[in-house]
């Protein structure tokens, strides 16, 4: 009997033989996924749910990344105004389990699990705390350079990250334990590829990202690390080799690091991706012949164990679903 989607992803994430190659693509559903505030405007959650439903019906993905459009923020009063230094955040305290920030996300995840979870594994998107701070400050017209914070006030920044990541760790645990998602999909990046040293990142940033993954691991989460290369952002991938995840997705096209190279870099962990994610890339603009040829090339290069075919990051909203189906067809000829 052929593996169902749950058995398929379980096998791939553990580098076991699978009946076929799974395919996982995703895109945003709200027009302003970063600035949208579903905590204050819960109707946005319904729009996101409708978007997930339409995409699932059209494509029937082998795994679902729960898109958290509207939930990018951390609605703490201290972060909802312009901040110029981490010392302005030293009084920050966790929002806690009783907050709407916490409860709304559990409700949202539970709803999706109740609809799709019986047959398809779901992974809840969370952003690491530095990315959340950047999103929130940019959203009020006050972009911040966290690499400056890291250089000028490292201990104060560490304190802020520690406090907020406590909330994210508790949320990740509850998403797995209570909402019954299969794992979290944690999005990280280097903050600044050129301005931040590896030592500073490992000391000040990494512990509070790893904390989130570790919390989900403790309750059985099968977790994914996403090293975000959106808009061509470059990362030092090796900085994440020791993070506690089962599968990893990075911007293979942007970084110039193939799936097989990434598999070696990340010590044999399962890999997700292969295709670029912009309107200039093949998955959006390619012909059936070209997309199928690239699918075969990716698998010839990466092998068929521990591989999920997908993209560097979210694909454009209007990517033809037929293009995604061509990948699945070619992968399983």
State each model region's role.
Residues 14-40, 70-71, 76-78, 123-156, ...:
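N-terminal small/glycine-rich loop or linker at the start of catalytic domains
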Residues 43-55, 164-174, 233-239, 289-298:
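Short, acidic/polar
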Residues 76-174, 202:
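Active-site-proximal, glycine-rich beta->alpha crossover segments in alpha/beta enzymes
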Residues 8-18, 32-35, 210, 214-333:
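Catalytic-face loop-and-helix region of soluble metabolic enzyme cores
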Residues 1-80, 107-114, 202, 206, ...:
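N-terminal basic, low-complexity leaders that serve as flexible interaction/assembly modules and, when applicable
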Residues 169-184, 210, 300-301:
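Alpha/beta enzyme core
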Residues 35-47, 146-170, 223-227, 279-290:
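Active-site mouth loops of central-metabolism enzymes
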Residues 63-86, 90-98, 182-199, 312-319:
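Glycine-rich, proline-tolerant flexible connector loops at the mouths of alpha/beta enzymes
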């Amino acid at each position: 009997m052929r593996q169902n989607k749950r058995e398929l992803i379980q096998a791939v994430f553990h580098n076991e033989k699978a009946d076929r190659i799974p395919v996982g693509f995703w895109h945003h559903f709200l027009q302003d996924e970063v600035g949208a505030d579903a905590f204050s405007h819960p109707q946005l959650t319904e729009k996101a749910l409708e978007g997930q439903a339409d995409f699932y019906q059209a494509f029937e993905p082998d795994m679902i990344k729960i898109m958290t459009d509207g939930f990018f923020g951390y609605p703490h009063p201290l972060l909802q105004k312009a901040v110029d230094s981490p010392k302005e955040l030293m009084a920050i305290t966790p929002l806690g389990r009783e907050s709407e920030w916490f409860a709304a996300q559990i409700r949202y995840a539970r709803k999706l699990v109740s609809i799709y979870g019986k047959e398809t594994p779901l992974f809840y998107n969370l952003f690491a705390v530095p990315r959340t701070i950047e999103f929130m400050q940019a959203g009020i017209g006050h972009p911040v350079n966290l690499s400056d914070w890291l250089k000028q006030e490292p201990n104060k920044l560490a304190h802020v990250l520690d406090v907020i990541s406590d909330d994210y760790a508790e949320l990740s645990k509850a998403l797995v334990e209570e909402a019954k998602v299969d794992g979290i999909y944690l999005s990280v990046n280097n903050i600044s590829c050129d301005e931040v040293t590896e030592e500073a990142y490992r000391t000040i940033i990494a512990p509070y990202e790893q904390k989130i993954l570790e919390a989900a691991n403790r309750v059985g989460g099968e977790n994914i690390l996403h090293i975000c290369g959106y808009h061509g952002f470059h990362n030092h991938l090796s900085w994440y080799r020791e993070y506690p995840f089962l599968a990893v997705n990075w911007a293979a096209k942007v970084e110039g690091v193939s799936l097989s190279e990434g598999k070696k870099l990340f010590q044999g962990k399962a890999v997700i991706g292969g295709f670029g994610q912009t309107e200039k890339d093949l998955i959006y603009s390619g012909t059936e012949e070209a997309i199928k040829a690239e699918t075969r090339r990716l698998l010839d290069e990466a092998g068929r164990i521990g591989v999920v075919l997908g993209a560097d990051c979210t694909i454009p909203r209007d990517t033809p679903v037929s293009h995604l189906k061509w990948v699945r067809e070619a992968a399983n000829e």
